[in-house]
Curated annotation (Swiss-Prot):
Subcellular location: Cytoplasm
Name of the protein in question: 2-isopropylmalate synthase
Source organism per UniProt: Buchnera aphidicola subsp. Acyrthosiphon pisum (strain APS) (Acyrthosiphon pisum symbiotic bacterium)
Origin: domain of life: Bacteria
Lineage of producing organism: Bacteria, Pseudomonadati, Pseudomonadota, Gammaproteobacteria, Enterobacterales
PANTHER family from the UniProt entry: 2-ISOPROPYLMALATE SYNTHASE 1, CHLOROPLASTIC-RELATED, HOMOCITRATE SYNTHASE-RELATED
The protein's role, per its UniProt record: Catalyzes the condensation of the acetyl group of acetyl-CoA with 3-methyl-2-oxobutanoate (2-ketoisovalerate) to form 3-carboxy-3-hydroxy-4-methylpentanoate (2-isopropylmalate).
Keyword Lipid metabolism belongs to the record: no
Domain Pyruvate carboxyltransferase: 5-267
């Protein structure tokens, strides 16, 4: 039977330290509930003594979390431990996490204490915390730069004092996998009562090795891993929990351990943390990045279409990702283009794959990424993108008439002759201009995604707006780029409207062809 690895999440404590602004109590609770649904064992939800707001958030979360065990941080100071115990008092079971530096550097330059004093402080604090709960975790801060003799000595003493979990933090992300493995193995060999406690590791990513170090610790005997969702945290961040969790699952053949995680909640939880914390996920981020299951190379796409296991070591659905598509770019091959046409229900006899692929490559070189509706237009209208811009924005103005209301006026070229003007009042300038544009186009759409990315710095910086809308159960993309955010937003919507119009022209032509065949 595989042994369990306890997953300890510190997104709401260590992770929040990386944010430019503190989260509200409501936002923290939303993240905590998502983590609980994901099956996280331990939730470190704050540092209660640090501020009244943090104390309140720990109190609130303690009342609402039922399945995960909650935990809060405290220094080896009485008021810290009291604050932690009182803030979590409404919970049936909780953990107090105490920490104290043990490295010579920290003892001498930061704490101004010798090692005997450090041990006395640690033991006193553990006794104080045991008045509130029997679940105590102790972190030897900067453990990976602590001498092995001192580390073994304090760990043995702490376990005798009643500590159930001993955490070995790589506080500054200094260690490497083999070194951390040796530290853990040394503890198991030299500390006689080590098996009375769970050994944990808390790795930072300053050298980009947090996940690798955590894996090596598991192989050496550690049975609790601490980290954060998306790896957010102080400086370069922490161990990314979604990565360590999936590494345990995918490589259970060599790690021989398991977790209690609900894997299908990983992607959703990652997105919630990203959105609430306002920290975008890099596209190349392992497990949850937008490119994690994307394939652009023609060779890879062909291999995936034949068998996904050729280029995917896990199924996207295993983390709760429902829809995964091949990216159509200039690197895509015929197999990917044909796959998209098949997915849309077209037969080989409906179009010429050679002609379509040639036209596709020209468009991909010009546009970058090509979508399904682009392929339809190439196959059945056979014109390049710049030839089918039905809508063109000639003029727009937006005025704010109050704190929340804006009015927009637009002049839109529809086809080659018709100019139309429209104005509307709505909540915010972008919404106002979108309503004005769509009042002219008359396409029923639902905005599903609006993303703004800055390109460059200073007054000459460009704003790129990416939007995704749904029209009659089909998704359409649009991109706008301008120094003015409102203009970029308008361009993105014009892009969408042209894509919808283009799809409608395809449908009209296909209907004519279908009626002709019937005759």
């Amino acid at each position: 039977m595989k042994s369990k690895v306890v997953i300890f999440d510190t997104t709401l404590r260590d992770g929040e330290q990386a944010l430019q602004a503190s989260l509200s109590v409501k936002e923290k609770l939303q993240i905590a509930l998502s983590l609980e649904k994901c099956g996280i064992d331990i939730l470190e939800i704050g540092f209660p003594v640090s501020s009244p707001g943090d104390f309140k958030s720990v109190q609130t979360i303690s009342k609402n979390i039922k399945n995960s065990r909650i935990c809060s941080l405290a220094r080896c100071i009485e008021k810290d431990i009291d604050a932690a115990g009182e803030a979590m008092s409404s919970s049936d079971s909780f953990r107090i996490h105490i920490f104290l530096a043990t490295s010579t550097l920290h003892m001498e330059s930061k704490l101004k204490k010798n090692f005997n004093e450090i041990i006395d402080m640690a033991v006193f604090s553990v006794k104080k915390a045991l008045r509130y709960t029997d679940d105590i975790e102790f972190s030897c801060e900067d453990a990976t730069r602590t001498t092995m003799d001192n580390l073994c000595r304090i760990v043995e003493t702490l376990i005798k004092s009643g500590v159930k979990t001993i955490n070995i933090p790589d506080t500054v992300g200094y260690t490497v996998p083999n070194e951390l493995s040796c530290i853990i193995k040394n503890l198991f060999e030299r500390v006689p009562n080590i098996h009375k406690s769970i050994i944990s590791v808390h790795c930072h990513d300053d050298l980009g090795m947090a996940v690798g170090n955590s894996i090596s610790a598991i192989q050496a005997g550690a049975r609790q891993i601490e980290g954060t969702i998306n790896g957010i945290g102080e400086r370069a961040g922490n161990t990314a929990l979604e990565e360590i969790i999936m590494a345990i699952k995918v490589r259970e053949d060599i790690l021989s351990v398991s977790t209690n995680i609900n894997y299908k909640e990983i992607y959703r939880t990652s997105k919630i943390v990203s959105q609430i914390c306002n920290m975008p996920i890099p596209s190349n981020k392992a497990i949850v990045g937008s490119n994690a299951f994307a394939h652009s190379s023609g060779i890879h796409q062909d291999g995936v279409l034949k068998n996904r296991k050729n280029y995917e070591i896990m199924e996207p659905s295993s983390i709760g990702l429902k829809e995964v598509k091949l990216n159509l770019t200039s690197r895509s091959g015929r197999a990917a283009v044909k796959h998209y046409m098949d997915e849309m229900g077209y037969n080989n006899s409906d179009y010429n794959i050679d002609e379509l692929y040639t036209a596709f490559l020209k468009l991909a070189d010009k546009k970058g990424q090509v979508f399904d509706y682009d392929l339809e237009a190439l196959a059945f209208i056979n014109k390049q993108q710049d030839e089918w811009e039905y809508f063109s924005l000639k003029f727009f103005s937006v005025q704010s008439i109050s704190n929340s209301l804006s009015t927009a006026s637009v002049k839109l070229l529809c086809g080659k002759k018709t100019y139309t003007e429209s104005s509307t009042t709505s909540n915010g300038p972008v919404d106002a201009i979108y309503q004005a544009l769509n009042r002219i186009a008359c396409f029923p759409i639902i905005l599903q995604k609006f993303q703004l990315v800055a390109k460059g710095k200073g007054k000459d910086a460009l704003g790129q707006v990416d939007i995704l809308v749904e029209h009659k159960k089909r998704k359409f993309h649009g991109v706008g780029l301008a120094t003015d955010i409102i203009e970029a937003s308008a361009q993105a919507m014009i892009n969408v409207l042209n894509n919808i119009w283009k799809a409608k022209q395809v449908n009209k032509k296909l209907k004519i062809l279908k009626d002709f065949k019937k005759k």
